[in-house]
Amino acid sequence: MNMSYLFFFFFIQLVLKYINSKVTENTICKDGFLIQMSNHFECNCNPGFVLTSESTCENKVECNANSLDKRCGDFSKCAYKDLQQKELTCKCIDGYDLEESICVPNECKNFRCESGKCVLDPKQEAKIPMCSCFIGIVPSKENNNTCTIEGQTECTLKCTKENETCKKTSGIYKCDCKDGYTFDKEENACISFSLFNILNLSIIFIISLIYFYII
């Protein structure tokens, strides 16, 4: 076996390990952001992006003649609707099944969690389905570990940017700007409302001056 083949083999193994790696509080979500529920972490994508793996987002496309195999939704791609290959539709990728318009792991098909969602146990190498609850709810041992009782989950997200903190939003934890600050896309940072308002007023003033002199 020559060295180039060995190198290629190990490179492929590293890529597969990265793609299939579990999402933790240390995961960096490409073109997305990390959230936490009661029993797991996951990446959510920025607007206009969809999940292609547990930690990677890509541009979302509409299925048409030029978008075969491209990503049209989380864990889904554009594929031919039938064997006649005349029409493309958005289908779940291998390993996922469609349930209530969402592509879920095969093992989570028909797996009910009540106030939460089915995920694959991040502590197991095998694909074992389990419930992860919305923040404020925890699994109940009396009810097959479904999300049915109130309970607290500590936020362990690493919100390290300046003026950033962990916040509960719509049943999840995520890193967000502290009270009194707002996120500025151009600066990619949380800035104070007062500074944000000053910048906006300055822009409005400059535009008004330009408009005045043109007219």
From Swiss-Prot:
Lipid moiety-binding region (GPI-anchor amidated serine): S192
Organism: Plasmodium gallinaceum
Keyword 4Fe-4S: no
Protein keywords: Cell membrane, Disulfide bond, EGF-like domain, Glycoprotein, GPI-anchor, Lipoprotein, Malaria, Membrane, Repeat, Signal
Pfam families tied to this protein: Plasmod_Pvs28
Glycosylation sites recorded in the entry for this protein: N144, N163, N200
Protein name: 25 kDa ookinete surface antigen
Domain EGF-like: 29-58, 59-104, 104-148, 151-191
Bridged cysteine pairs (disulfide): C63-C78, C72-C90, C92-C103, C108-C118, C113-C131, C133-C147, C155-C166, C159-C175, C177-C190
Residues spanning the signal sequence: 1-16
Annotated Gene Ontology cellular component terms: cell surface; plasma membrane; side of membrane
